[in-house]
């Protein structure tokens, strides 16, 4: 049996690096409203931690044709939980950080048996930094992809180096080493920062030790590859994620068979190159993850327009997400060959809502399918 937890504030918790951490309102609301979603990848009879059991059951009811029968529990339920079969019990959060560990231990000290050590959490945090992917993954993927790939990222520890790198790039993307989707990222069309941007970047350097500076590419298409790292360090490729974002914030995913997604992706990327990159990711990260990280993760990529307008280049590592992703959720909702393609979207009005639409009723911008 597993206890599943949707803790979307994970990326911000990594930046804070504290046991006692209060997430921003949006992160807390997302967790409250969508805490039920592990039901879609959990196994029959697993537990899912939520803030409100009745609300989770009601939200789940609207999507009852998808997912498994699970048991929704609250932190109050965990306080009285008796561990009868510790050999088979596991805790599976969206992402591991010091905060979620402390929350579980405050609920029930017996969870200590299933918690990663503080050293392991520190290692996971370091590998979750954008600096890790920029230095240990992206260069090797570029080397393997040769002239068919683009992508570079520089970790800058002073504003002098930030300005030098921006001047070299012309147009840049500045990213906090740790931040959540859409946050901690600035797109800059100029070769030098204005006063506001310089103040923001200097603050990131002060708080996190440095900042990532990357060229701003002419992106044509977003996609990702989803993986799972096993206990022995071996890594399995789980599938392709075709998704849409706006301003760096997640909008939704295409739900389709792997064959259909490959056909869509083939319009913008060399599938043989994508397959080769996938193999290299498994081989490169296996050595880093073995004995440290077990669980789901994903690598976001993008197709970039060539400067001469003739085709596309592959950026093989825009982000390494060392946690479960919305792409993994989309894979859990993959339709059969006989079922129609669908769109999974996350939207916010008075609350966060997850919806699944047939493509004929696509409420997302159609750029999720074609640019």
Question: Where would I find each of the regions flagged by the language model?
Answer:
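Phosphate-binding site of ATP-dependent enzymes
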Residues: 170, 196-251, 302-306, 310-317
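A long amphipathic alpha-helix within ATP-dependent nucleotide-binding catalytic cores
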Residues: 208, 237, 250-312, 352-370
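C-terminal active-site "lid" helix and adjoining low-complexity regulatory extension at the edge
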Residues: 309-314, 322-371
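ATP-grasp fold ATP-binding core
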Residues: 137, 166-187, 206-219, 299, ...
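ATP-dependent carboxylate/phosphate-activation module, predominantly the ATP-grasp catalytic core
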Residues: 227-283, 321-346
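N-terminal-proximal low-complexity accessory segments that begin disordered
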Residues: 1-46
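Conserved N-proximal alpha/beta basic substrate-recognition cap immediately N-terminal to
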Residues: 28-40, 49-164
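Glycine-rich phosphate-binding loop of ATP-grasp-fold ATP-dependent ligases
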Residues: 152-155, 172-197, 224, 248-264
């Amino acid at each position: 049996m597993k206890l599943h937890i949707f803790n979307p504030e994970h990326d911000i918790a990594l930046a804070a690096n504290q046991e006692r951490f209060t997430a921003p309102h949006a992160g807390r609301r997302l967790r409250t409203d969508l805490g039920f979603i592990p039901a879609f990848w959990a196994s029959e009879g697993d537990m899912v931690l939520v803030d409100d059991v009745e609300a989770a059951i009601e939200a789940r009811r609207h999507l009852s044709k998808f997912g498994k029968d699970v048991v929704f529990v609250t932190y109050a339920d965990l306080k009285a939980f008796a561990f009868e079969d510790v050999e088979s019990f596991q805790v599976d959060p969206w992402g591991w950080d010091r905060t979620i560990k402390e929350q579980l231990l405050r609920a029930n000290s017996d969870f200590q048996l299933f918690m990663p050590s503080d050293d392991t959490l520190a290692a996971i945090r370091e590998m979750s930094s954008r600096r890790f992917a920029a230095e240990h993954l992206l260069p090797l993927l570029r080397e393997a992809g040769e002239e068919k790939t683009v992508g570079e990222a520089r970790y800058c520890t002073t504003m002098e180096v930030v300005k030098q790198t921006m001047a070299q790039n012309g147009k840049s993307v500045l990213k906090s080493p740790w931040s959540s989707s859409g946050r901690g990222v600035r797109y800059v069309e100029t070769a030098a920062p204005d006063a506001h941007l310089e103040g923001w970047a200097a603050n990131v350097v002060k708080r996190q030790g440095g900042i990532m500076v990357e060229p701003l590419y002419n992106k044509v298409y977003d996609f990702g590859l989803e993986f799972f790292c096993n206990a022995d360090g071996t890594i399995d490729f789980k599938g392709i994620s075709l998704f849409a974002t706006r301003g760096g914030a997640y909008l939704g995913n295409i739900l389709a068979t792997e064959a259909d997604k490959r056909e869509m992706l083939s319009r913008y990327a060399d599938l043989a190159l994508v397959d080769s990159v996938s193999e290299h990711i498994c081989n490169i990260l296996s050595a880093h993850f073995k004995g440290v990280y077990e669980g789901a993760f994903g690598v976001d990529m993008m197709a970039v327009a060539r400067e001469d307008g003739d085709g596309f280049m592959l950026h093989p590592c825009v982000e390494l997400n060392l946690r479960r992703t919305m792409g993994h959720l989309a894979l859990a909702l993959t339709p059969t060959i006989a079922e129609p393609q669908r769109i999974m979207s996350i939207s916010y009005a008075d609350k966060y809502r997850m919806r699944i639409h047939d493509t004929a009723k696509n409420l997302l911008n159609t750029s999720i399918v074609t640019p």
